[in-house]
UniProtKB/Swiss-Prot annotation:
Keywords: Hydrolase. This is Epoxide hydrolase 3. Residues 25-302 form the AB hydrolase-1 domain. Pathway: Secondary metabolite biosynthesis; terpenoid biosynthesis. The gene is EPH3. Epoxide hydrolase involved in the biosynthesis of cucurbitacin and mogroside tetracyclic triterpene natural products (e.g. siamenoside I and mogrosides IV, V and VI). Cucurbitacins have cytotoxic properties and exhibit deterrent taste as a defense barrier against herbivores. Mogrosides are nonsugar highly oxygenated compounds used as high-intensity zero-calorie sweeteners; they also possess pharmacological properties such as regulating immunity, lowering blood sugar and lipid levels, protecting the liver, and acting as antioxidants and antitumor agents. Belongs to the AB hydrolase superfamily. Epoxide hydrolase family. The keyword Hydrolase applies. Homodimer. Its EC number is 3.3.2.10, 3.3.2.-.
């Protein structure tokens, strides 16, 4: 990890922290919730060893990157704006893009807004979500899963923060990263995050050192910036009306664990495998379903994910 360089740049009105290693064509890695650049530690080291420059920012609201106060500052347009500005600041014209969880959502929007900056995309866990002009995102999730669904619970500023503050931060990360349930996460108001059982032991792919890194950073920053992505999701829906029906026009490989909760959302498998996904993403070249893998697949199965990323981007 010592070879990873940590830089801070100005972009789109914020200061952004980026982990960077290697030389060659650039691979931009976008983390999810509740994560950091650190989630890509295995991919950063691997990609740099096979001839790429791998860069992984702390996204807006996370880690050592600035965290604007207003939830309205966290739309996909803001986040993609940060990333375009970062590439400009670093003198990078085009990248291979890799996203996971919220990073995957941002990656889909990056490809919608600025396909000219993307050579190819490898996305993990979250398939493309076509915009339904009649139903905002959170309303759709509320209809499908009810008020206790975690995205719905995260909407009111301060509520989730209060819940998280009542739990040891390291314990919270153990519970989040090790949750192997494929059921939609529901957080009843009276119980909150304690509704998800903590693991008895850490899995082999996660160490106490890893947990402590996440916990230390989030103790410094709190969770508000990260939660604001959910609070701005419907504003993103509103502002992206011009892209209703637009297709993703970059080459794509999609990877998901067969035990990933996102893969078990109602309609997800049908959309991914029965033609809907390919219609919205016409340059979708491959869908990989990884057996016995859960949501944090880039950390749980790093060697497989490294190989899948390299095999795809090596074609271009």
């Amino acid at each position: 990890m010592d070879q990873i360089e940590h830089i801070t740049i100005n972009t789109n009105g914020i200061k952004m922290h980026i982990a960077s290693v290697g030389t060659g064509p650039v691979v931009l890695l976008l983390h999810g919730f509740p994560e950091l650049w650190y989630s890509w530690r295995h991919q950063l080291l691997y990609l740099s060893s096979v001839g790429y420059r791998a860069i992984a920012p702390d996204l807006r609201g996370y880690g050592d990157t600035d965290s604007p106060a207003s939830p309205t500052s966290y739309t996909a347009l803001h986040i993609v704006g940060d990333l375009v500005g970062a590439l400009d600041e670093l003198g990078i014209e085009k990248v291979f893009l890799v996203g996971h969880d919220w990073g995957a959502i941002i990656a889909w929007y990056f490809c919608l807004f600025r396909p000219d900056r993307i050579k190819a995309l490898v996305n993990l866990s979250v398939q493309f979500i076509p915009r339904n002009p009649a139903i905002p995102f959170i309303e759709g999730f509320r209809t499908a899963f009810g008020d206790d669904f975690y995205m719905c619970r995260f909407q009111v500023p301060g509520e989730a923060e209060e819940d998280f503050a009542s739990i040891d931060t390291a314990q919270l990360f153990k519970t989040s990263l090790c949750n192997r349930s494929s059921a939609p996460p529901c957080l009843p108001k009276e119980i909150g995050f304690r509704a998800i059982p903590p693991p008895e032991n850490l899995p082999s792919w996660l160490t106490e050192e890893d947990i402590n890194y996440y916990a230390a950073k989030f103790k410094q920053t709190g969770f508000t910036g990260a939660l604001n992505y959910y609070r701005a999701f419907d504003l993103t829906w509103e502002l992206t009306a011009p892209w209703t029906g637009a297709q993703i026009q970059v080459p794509v490989k999609f990877i998901v664990g067969d035990s990933d909760l996102t893969y078990h959302f109602p309609g997800a498998k049908e959309y991914i495998h029965n033609g809907g996904f390919k219609k919205d993403v016409p340059l979708l070249e491959e869908v990989v379903v990884v057996k016995d893998a859960c949501h944090f697949i880039n950390q749980e199965r790093p060697q497989e994910i490294n190989a899948h990323i390299h095999d795809f981007i090596n074609k271009f």
